[in-house]
Amino acid sequence: LKNRLNLLKIISIILLYTFFATGCTENENNKKKPKEYTHFYPSERITSDIDRHETVYVPVYSHVYTSDEKYELMGITLSVRNTDFKQNMWIKKISYYSTQGELLESYVSKSHELNPMASIDFVVDLNDIRGGSGANFIVEWEGSKTLSNPIIQAVMVNNSGNKAFSFITNGENLK
């Protein structure tokens, strides 16, 4: 009987250790992958074809209200997509502003070239609530007048717990 109790204790300890050890490991899908971009790079514009300069406003939400005092946090991904098959575009600046209009981050502060049909994304983590419910990105880009219009949008996501929220906002050209 004593041997059985000792064996049960050992098995219980092994099971508890296994339970806690596997519960504390990071999910492979949630690990951040290093970004290696060969399609988006700093560039001094050598071409004289640049005759189009645009500024795009993209509304985003670091949280959305579910009632007067309750809100859900949102992870934000800004996506800039060059939809032209042949021409590069240049991203001059990408800035992230709070509800109060305070500059929070400068994701791009000098000209970067984006290859044809390429995309680039910038992420604001789920727990970063500095932006608020009225946050926004300003994207300044340039290219040739014949360049296809890029698609610039943001995706907000929260899938924690038993609820999931996801929606997209489109960028609007400023005059």
Segment roles from a protein language model:
Residues 2-11:
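Bacterial N-terminal signal peptides that target proteins for export
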Residues 33-70, 159-175:
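Transition segment at domain starts
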Residues 70-77, 135:
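Short, solvent-exposed loop/turn segments enriched in Ser/Thr/Gly
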Residues 80-87:
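Asparagine-centered strand-capping/turn motif at beta-strand->loop junctions
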Residues 99-136:
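Intrinsically disordered, low-complexity Pro/Gly/Ser/Thr-rich segments with frequent PxxP/GP/PP motifs
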Residues 28-36, 128-175:
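Terminal connector regions
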Residues 20-23:
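C-terminal motif of bacterial Sec signal peptides marking the signal peptidase cleavage site
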Residues 87-94, 105-106, 149-152:
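Short, hydrophobic/aromatic beta-strand segments
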